Amino acid sequence: MSERKLFTSESVSEGHPDKIADQISDAILDAVLVQDPDAHVAAETAVYTGSVHVFGEISTTAYVDINRVVRDTIAEIGYTDTAYGFSAETVGVHPSLVEQSPDIAQGVNEALEVRGHHEQDDLDLIGAGDQGLMFGFAVDETPELMPLPISLAHRLVRKLAELRKSGEIAYLRPDAKSQVTVEYDENDKPVRVDTVVISTQHDPEATNEQIHRDVIEKVIKAVIPAEYLDAKTKYLINPTGRFVIGGPQGDSGLTGRKIIVDTYGGYARHGGGAFSGKDATKVDRSASYAARYIAKNIVAAGLAKKAEVQLAYAIGVAQPVSVRVDTFGTALVAESKLEQAVRQIFDLRPAGIIKMLDLKRPIYRQTAAYGHVGRTDIDLPWEKLDKVEELKKAVQA
């Protein structure tokens, strides 16, 4: 009998407390970058019933109305009714932002490679904003080269938000979570969806029967391809029986607490660093995007069925301390050749990544919900497949 395995990933909606915090942090980052593309930003947010605290470090020439950015972001998410216990116009906003530490700025603004040298490469100027390790991943399970469980989980909560905002399901409120369990065959190919869990906040008048029917027909069956659903697929819709109190009224939220949702749903490794609220000199963010860019182009080039790229940095140093490519035995060429090609084609110094992916632009608020990678609904530079031919040529050399 062939062995089959299950793998589960989850996602959360834009109205989830942690995602509210992520979106506020990235909205502040974008507002700063509009005026000052060279700003250094590390904006953290905490949300809870009736309050938002924004804190962290910013070095910039820009002036941003933090209060307005916070309220506009909350309103766009959909918290516009005081009945939700958290509303854009009535929430208390408490900013506490200070200038970046000069000790950190010293290493970021002048990397180890150029200190004391008169001749220098401009891309050596920026040192990594911290030490750390970052991962990027791609697999040929979906057209966007993402693991199927996280891809479906994101699409489910995105569909819920779409139906809520359009008014098609008027009783929906902003907070929601999804979880998808996919069955894989002995060749590691997804064959069916075993279980779908959706918990969605709702008005008190909505009945469980109505929610169950609408979610299955208008969300699950509209999102998950029919070939993955069968008579044995299990649907768990609001399994607690009631989800009226939600958002920051139900749970506090913090920036950076949904790092697995933000990436590959647990299918690939994670270096531990969060993304939102950080400018691109923070390699937690920019190098993770670069690693995804590399992995996606490797798989798209047909050089491997799956690829995981690890990058690692030392604070104040421009060049990565290590580059690793792992293809889990699926590569058509030696992994050492892939690593050599990666170093040859991709400039992995922080300034090189920023230039390669054009990361000084205000593009981050849109990434703060429904995943930073594998997006098909928005245009992100690290999802481009413009290095495929170069990689093919490099490994043949």
From Swiss-Prot:
Entry EC number(s): 2.5.1.6
Keywords from the UniProt entry: ATP-binding, Cytoplasm, Magnesium, Metal-binding, Nucleotide-binding, One-carbon metabolism, Potassium, Transferase
Names of the cofactor(s): Mg(2+); K(+)
Binding sites annotated in the UniProt record for ATP: H16, D175, A176, K177, R242, F243, D251, R257, K258, A274, K278
UniProt keyword Nucleotide-binding present: yes
Subcellular localization: Cytoplasm
Oligomer and partners: Homotetramer; dimer of dimers.
Record's protein name: S-adenosylmethionine synthase
Organism: Streptococcus mutans serotype c (strain ATCC 700610 / UA159)
Gene this protein is translated from: metK
